[in-house]
């Protein structure tokens, strides 16, 4: 059924969507000209958000005196929150507090188009961008005429990240350590040898497989070296004179992985007699088959139906179920939107292929059934609202995962792997920008006064400075959501953004219940807690720690040790009202402050964690089956999107966007380089768009980096799109490689066709698939639930 925007109201539509549908193009309105251009941002990456602030400040400094200044408003809730906020403002025709630009996905353009509020960038020069990455503008419904409505300023794709040490243990166990011999451990702790009936074979006659196996072996050797170093440290503590092997031993890594993964079992339908080839990672069908076989081979996976946070989570982790289903179904349909769930042509969306159970419906059933075997073996981990696979993979709890290339900075553990562990065995990585909360002082040690019974605790912040360590500010969007990761954790993460510079730059913040006493100022040097649950937990922790301290102290010392009763952070952790609570900000902080209670700090050995050099980064599967003719790669990321305001503001909006894309200016080098020499230089000349992508693991789709056949070599020495973070970032390297192939038509780019209903379609298929993973539902139950969530609007 083809649906023309502005003519039909579907009974199942969300309230806001129904209002917009009723208005149609007649809903267009002018905003009040307030003499400024407002950019709405839902960025949760601190690096990207800080870069955007720097860009706006720069524009306001260099613009002509008569040009309108730019200001940023932050919208909570990520891109979904931004979309919802925009829909609300459209529905009430907000003329006074709307915005001119928004960073979001192209379906927002469709929402705007239904009421005539889209703004074409017809005055913006986009000739620097590769046209392949502007093609999505042809697949946006509800716009009145073809044009450029969204400009990709931060592209990413997905990669398949292999955990080298874990995969080595799986394969080595299945093929036997020597010939057909498998070494296992008895309940008494002694080793015993077991003969494998049909060991796994690694097809090293295939050059790709041989190369991949070498990479896997090297990763295990590196992890084995860490295990040996840990042993050496323990021996040194015991005053042993033994030395360790600096070369690294893969068998040492296998022993360490085995502690958590358990013994390999040779079973029918598992890895017994299987031939391993690198090509299994090229397509979804073979990847899921291999994953299912591996899951069947380990009891700690297949027999664990109720996984705790510290358990092995499975073989394969998937961060976006919708992405995986969409790309596999698109690939199964020969990379053709005519064979996809829906398509957009001539400004109209057509869902008939799915609705009429056409090829996309049949392909979805095939894909789902491939997943079903892995689901039944408890071998699939899916992200259910914040628990990203990188959190588990970096602690060797997954064999491999499919993740966004924008997530490089939080995908690996630091030199000191720390996490905050809750009583139920769930955990979050020790967030950056975190300081401990100390119990009220009882002996006048300078931390606080103890005369006020309402004082719950104190924490210390250093003076916040403009420039922060770039490598520690990137990609915070996925941090700390209970069993979720944080980038570069463990690298002295204790402290606020610039803690520990000088003692005399620090400020002690006091936490109170009931009321803040005279002489203290809320939001400056004091916080008032109103949540009774949080108050009780802080008080109980102080009492418990105080009692333990008195028992331990005895006659050893008259100086009381500082008692930690919780932690506070501005990292992007999600409050749950149980252990993580939102509290007031200090000194107008840009990010929400949280208090975390009921946790203990856990430090893991390095051999229990995944380092970046131990990961093998591959493209996410580009085909559904190996016989498919076309290879598919997803392109994703927010676009800069214009919103109609009035004639003057529309012109000023386009002027800013054109400057953002095309005008080279001097930027402070220390803001966008991790190279120490670069940080000593005063400036670096580039466009604002180039400066922005360097803030995180993003790609700007410039023609010059795709059209040059020797792109990698030339770009590494070029001032264009050169980012020290990108060149050392294996995820971005893989993204550049894939995007170059897209620009040459060697592979097909997939992005969601943009319609006002596409967000609901995506959310529906993802949430129902995740529910099917939990319930182990079959395809009929899954698709029935999915269709029910769509209602009558599709």
Curated annotation (Swiss-Prot):
Pfam families: Lipoprotein_10, Lipoprotein_X
Highest taxon listed in the record's lineage: Bacteria
Lipidation sites (N-palmitoyl cysteine): 23
Membrane topology: Lipid-anchor
Signal sequence coordinates: 1-22
Gene Ontology terms: cellular component: plasma membrane
Location of this chain's protein in the cell: Cell membrane
Keywords on record: Cell membrane, Lipoprotein, Membrane, Palmitate, Signal
Cysteine disulfide links: none
Covalent lipid sites (S-diacylglycerol cysteine): 23
Bias (Polar residues) ranges: 177-196, 238-250
Feature: compositional bias, Low complexity: 220-231
Disordered: annotated span: 177-208, 220-257, 466-506
Family assignment from sequence similarity: Belongs to the MG185/MG260 family.
Name used for this protein in its record: Uncharacterized lipoprotein MPN_284
Organism (species): Mycoplasma pneumoniae (strain ATCC 29342 / M129 / Subtype 1) (Mycoplasmoides pneumoniae)
């Amino acid at each position: 059924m083809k649906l023309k925007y502005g003519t039909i109201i579907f009974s199942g539509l969300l309230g806001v969507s129904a209002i917009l549908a009723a208005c149609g193009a007649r809903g267009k309105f002018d905003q009040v000209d307030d003499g400024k251009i407002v950019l709405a941002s839902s960025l949760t990456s601190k690096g990207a958000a800080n870069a955007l602030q720097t860009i706006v400040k720069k524009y306001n400094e260099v613009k002509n005196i008569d040009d309108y200044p730019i200001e940023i408003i932050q919208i909570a809730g990520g891109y979904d929150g931004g979309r919802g906020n925009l829909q609300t403002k459209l529905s009430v025709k907000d003329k006074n507090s709307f915005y001119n630009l928004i960073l979001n996905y192209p379906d927002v353009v469709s929402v705007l188009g239904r009421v005539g509020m889209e703004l074409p960038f017809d005055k913006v020069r986009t000739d620097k961008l590769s046209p392949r990455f502007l093609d999505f503008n042809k697949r946006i419904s509800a716009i009145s005429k073809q044009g450029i409505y969204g400009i990709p300023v931060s592209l990413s794709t997905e990669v398949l990240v292999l955990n080298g040490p874990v995969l080595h243990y799986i394969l080595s166990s299945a093929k036997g350590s020597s010939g057909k011999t498998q070494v296992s451990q008895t309940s008494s702790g002694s080793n015993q040898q077991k003969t494998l009936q049909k060991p796994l074979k690694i097809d090293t006659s295939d050059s790709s497989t041989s190369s991949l196996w070498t990479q896997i072996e090297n990763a295990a050797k590196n992890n084995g070296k860490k295990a040996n170093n840990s042993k050496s440290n323990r021996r040194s503590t015991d005053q042993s004179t033994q030395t360790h092997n600096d070369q690294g031993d893969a068998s040492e890594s296998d022993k360490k992985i085995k502690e958590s993964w358990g013994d390999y079992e040779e079973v029918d339908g598992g890895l017994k007699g299987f031939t391993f080839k690198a090509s299994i990672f090229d397509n979804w069908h073979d990847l899921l088959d291999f994953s299912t076989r591996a899951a069947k081979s380990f009891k700690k996976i297949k027999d664990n139906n109720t996984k705790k946070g510290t358990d092995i989570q499975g073989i394969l982790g998937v961060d976006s179920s919708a992405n995986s289903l969409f790309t596999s179904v698109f690939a199964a349909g020969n990379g053709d939107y005519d064979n996809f769930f829906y398509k957009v042509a001539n400004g109209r969306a057509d869902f008939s292929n799915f609705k009429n159970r056409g090829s996309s419906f049949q392909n979805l059933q095939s894909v789902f059934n491939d997943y079903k075997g892995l689901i039944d073996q408890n071998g699939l981990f899916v992200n259910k609202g914040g628990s990203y696979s990188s959190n588990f993979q970096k602690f060797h709890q997954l064999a491999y995962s499919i993740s966004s290339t924008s997530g490089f900075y939080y995908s690996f553990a630091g030199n000191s792997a720390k996490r905050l562990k809750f009583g139920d065995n769930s955990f979050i990585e020790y967030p950056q920008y975190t300081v401990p909360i100390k119990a009220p002082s009882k002996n006048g040690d300078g931390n606080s006064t103890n005369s006020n019974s309402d004082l719950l605790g104190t924490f210390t912040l250093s003076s916040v400075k403009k420039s922060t360590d770039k490598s520690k500010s990137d990609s915070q969007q996925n941090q700390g959501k209970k069993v979720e990761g944080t980038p570069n954790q463990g690298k002295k993460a204790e402290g606020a953004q610039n803690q520990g510079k000088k003692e005399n730059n620090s400020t002690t913040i006091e936490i109170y219940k009931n009321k803040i006493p005279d002489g203290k100022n809320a939001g400056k040097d004091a916080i008032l807690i109103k949540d009774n649950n949080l108050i009780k937990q802080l008080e109980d922790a102080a009492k418990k720690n105080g009692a333990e301290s008195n028992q331990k102290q005895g006659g050893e010392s008259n100086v009381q040790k500082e008692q930690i009763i919780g932690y506070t952070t501005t990292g992007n952790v999600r409050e749950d009202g149980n252990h993580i609570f939102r509290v007031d900000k200090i000194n107008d902080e840009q990010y929400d402050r949280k208090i975390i209670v009921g946790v203990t700090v856990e430090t893991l050995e390095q051999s229990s964690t995944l380092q970046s050099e131990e990961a093998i980064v591959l493209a996410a599967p580009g085909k559904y089956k190996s016989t498919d003719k076309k290879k598919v790669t997803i392109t994703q990321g927010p676009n800069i999107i214009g919103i109609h305001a009035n004639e003057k503001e529309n012109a000023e909006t386009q002027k800013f966007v054109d400057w953002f894309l095309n005008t080279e200016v001097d930027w402070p080098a220390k803001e966008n380089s991790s190279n120490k020499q670069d940080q000593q230089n005063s400036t670096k000349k580039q466009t604002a768009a180039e400066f922005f992508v360097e803030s995180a693991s993003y790609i700007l789709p410039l023609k010059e980096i795709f059209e040059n056949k020797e792109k990698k070599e030339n770009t590494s020495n070029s001032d264009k799109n050169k980012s020290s973070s990108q060149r050392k970032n294996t995820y971005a390297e893989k993204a550049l490689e894939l995007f170059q192939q897209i620009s040459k038509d060697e592979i097909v780019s997939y992005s969601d066709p943009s319609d006002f209903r596409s967000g609901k379609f995506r959310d529906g298929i993802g949430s129902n698939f995740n529910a099917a993973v939990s319930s182990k539902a079959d395809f009929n139950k899954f698709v029935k639930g999915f269709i029910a969530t769509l209602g009558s609007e599709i």
